[in-house]
């Protein structure tokens, strides 16, 4: 009886063992391919890749910003055995201050990054040194290959790999590479995870020249800051968006005044002064209230309520036409045109010119003013706004509004991104998008469908602006063989704009010039704004800069002359 039970147990054990062996054979031999592939797939899920950030290009495909492969140095302080010796040696090789390195080595940390973008010599020396806790690794860093050129436009990559300011900030989600999970050896993974590439409308050569002209104004005219914008008035394409002073985005951490990061063309308000006069007069002409030949008698000053408005230098001009008002930049003449138009229509035109709304150019931090003081309905506010005081706008708003004279009465919306390739939005441009809801803000051309002034009015005012260059205060803008149209502007800067808690205006000035050419077949429109130059008026500061830049563009683009 006992033997039977023992045999039964042995049989059960043998059968159980045989079942296990059969199962192992099935899994390891018959189903080996299936489970191998399954394991391989599971491994693939746990191999992440941070995609490279997209590149930023100039119009000519010149790289403005890109992720560059590099070697970098880091230390693990807990693993460093002789901290004094290590600090000395690392300082000798890298050129970093020994005190800075020693401070990093004293931290209770597993990772302290010391230096990026190591040279081959530095990298090899560090590896040969082979110090405990000192490591050289491969990495990627964001580089701005054109240095400070267009720095406020491009912005920079800040902490936590987040885009700051400009294109880097506004299009951060598009530029940022995505994290993907890939199978080792899959070469397509890196391409698929890369962020979108952004192609700008900026022309590197003209941008470079414009920035040099601003630097020259800084050194020779004492200009504190300034901007130059060049735009195609037919499309709104921005060829130049230059700022002074600029900064080196590769070393942005060294900048002490954070205001330098701001793009003054879209982030700083100013009062335009006399460059507003053509818009005021155009509004009245468009409504049939006046014509270019309408005359009035200037007495040198004008009383409105308890206020008195004077001409520049208290000049008395006598009888003048509206064309002469622009030539001589007569304040009371602009007030006369506004009075003929009426305050309600005047405000309607200011709104149509886009002075109470942003342009949507697609740069981080664009601002605008609602001009609440102007909207209070006081007659004196309308009067001063007619010649550009008491109304606050940005340079980009100004060039957008002025484009109506060079574009048959229609307003060109400025844009600076031509197209986006790859990334979360593939191959996007405004020109091939099906509608407003499908496009990305600021990408590609878009002409306002709304006619702001009639083509006839636009042509009339353009001719008046040619007279300003030929016979007025902008003679220094003339270029032989070409008809150019433009207007000077000099406006007092409010105390509040220079950080003084005080009402009224200082003796400091904004000096500007806006012009286009050739006047009757425009290819470019240029806006120049200078903050507090040492010259008395824009005639001696902004106008010569316009001429030099316009001459460069005419030669560079090979624009044929109007006459021999």
Q: Where are the language model's segments positioned?
A:
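Short pre-catalytic segments that frame enzyme active sites
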Residues: 30-48, 62, 66-85, 104, ...
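Hydrophobic alpha-helical transmembrane signal-anchor segments
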Residues: 1-34
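Short, gly/Ser/Thr-rich active-site loops of penicillin-recognizing serine hydrolases
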Residues: 442, 544-564
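Small/polar-residue-rich segments within soluble enzyme cores
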Residues: 85-92, 104-195, 504, 528
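Second-shell loop/turn segments in exported
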Residues: 43-45, 71-79, 87-90, 108-116, ...
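Beta-lactam-recognizing serine transpeptidase/beta-lactamase-like catalytic domain environment
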Residues: 65, 228, 232-274, 279-425, ...
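Solvent-exposed coil/turn segments that connect beta secondary-structure elements
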Residues: 24, 32, 60-62, 69, ...
